[in-house]
């Protein structure tokens, strides 16, 4: 679909494929497995399509980005930001704008499918803070129900985790085009987040790196925890809490020792053993 899209709209960078896989994997990780199996085919289609299209807006040129800034009414919020800062902050909303304008080329199964995907993109583009504004569910002509709120909630957290996974304070996106491939690989290998996994109903994030790098990750994780709490609270306001698709009840951050700290600790242990002798 992206290849077809690029032929008709060549100003789009093909950035989103691998990130789409990360989002899908994290959605799978944080969803209740039985409820995941019970999703109907239309819900699966909308969730995966929203994950796929979430970041196609990252490659807009200045002219089209300005047009979408006007359309979204965010001129004031972007006045003091650089092109890349605007793109980094609002690219998911730009993705929604692209689907609104050009989505028909993808031949979605119905207008309701397209509408559901766009609504989810708007939700995660607004940092997952307006769940109450989403419709509870959409009923299709085949009588399948798309649980819009539940899917959007999972997608929002999955997207935030995918972005967290690749966070790296060494990497300057303003200078990204100046890096060669070996340098970019080096950045990826030094990512601060080492693992994200579910343990006993908790999502455990393990991170290392320098103090400054860890502080950045800690700030990002705290935002994810705060958003997750708001999302779950919003879902819990309803009488049927069983509709919640999450398998996790909390998110935790654990710090791993950096290579430098680990080496220092090992050296100290060796010195103590020598002194004991």
Q: Where is each model-derived feature located?
A:
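Acidic/His-rich, divalent-metal-binding segments that scaffold phosphate/diphosphate chemistry
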Residues: 1-78, 258-277
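Charged, amphipathic alpha-helical oligomerization/scaffolding segments
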Residues: 18, 22, 153, 223, ...
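Catalytic cores of large soluble enzymes that bind and process phosphate-bearing ligands
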Residues: 15, 87, 216
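A general structural signal for alpha-helical elements within enzymatic catalytic domains
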Residues: 28, 32-35, 100, 104, ...
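Divalent metal-dependent catalytic cores for phosphoryl transfer on phosphate-bearing substrates
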Residues: 35-201
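C-terminal effector/catalytic modules and regulatory tails appended to multi-domain proteins
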Residues: 175-277
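Glycine- and acidic
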Residues: 5-12, 80-81, 203-211
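Short secondary-structure junctions and interdomain/linker hinges
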Residues: 5-12, 128, 161-168, 231, ...
């Amino acid at each position: 679909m992206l290849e077809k899209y690029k032929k008709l709209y060549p100003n789009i960078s093909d950035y989103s494929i691998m990130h789409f896989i990360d989002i899908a994997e994290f959605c799978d990780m944080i969803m209740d497995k039985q409820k995941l199996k019970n999703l109907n085919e239309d819900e699966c289609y909308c969730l995966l399509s929203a994950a796929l299209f979430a970041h196609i807006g990252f490659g807009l040129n200045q002219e089209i980005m300005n047009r979408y800034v006007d359309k979204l009414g965010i001129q004031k919020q972007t006045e003091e930001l650089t092109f890349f800062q605007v793109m980094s902050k609002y690219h998911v909303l730009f993705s929604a704008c692209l689907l609104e304008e050009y989505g028909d080329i993808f031949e979605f199964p119905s207008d309701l499918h397209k509408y559901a995907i766009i609504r989810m993109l708007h939700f995660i583009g607004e940092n997952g803070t307006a769940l109450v504004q989403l419709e509870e569910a959409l009923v299709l002509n085949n009588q399948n129900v798309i649980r819009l709120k539940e899917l959007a909630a999972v997608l929002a957290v999955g997207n935030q985790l995918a972005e967290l996974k690749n966070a790296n304070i060494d990497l300057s996106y303003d200078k990204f085009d100046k890096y060669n491939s070996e340098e970019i690989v080096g950045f990826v290998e030094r990512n601060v987040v080492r693992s994200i996994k579910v343990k006993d109903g908790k999502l455990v994030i393990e991170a290392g790196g320098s103090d400054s790098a860890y502080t950045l990750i800690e700030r990002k994780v705290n935002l994810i925890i705060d958003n997750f709490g708001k999302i779950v609270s919003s879902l819990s306001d309803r009488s049927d809490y069983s509709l919640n698709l999450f398998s996790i009840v909390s998110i935790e951050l654990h710090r791993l020792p950096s290579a430098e700290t680990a080496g220092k600790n090992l050296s100290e242990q060796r010195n103590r053993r020598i002194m004991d002798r």
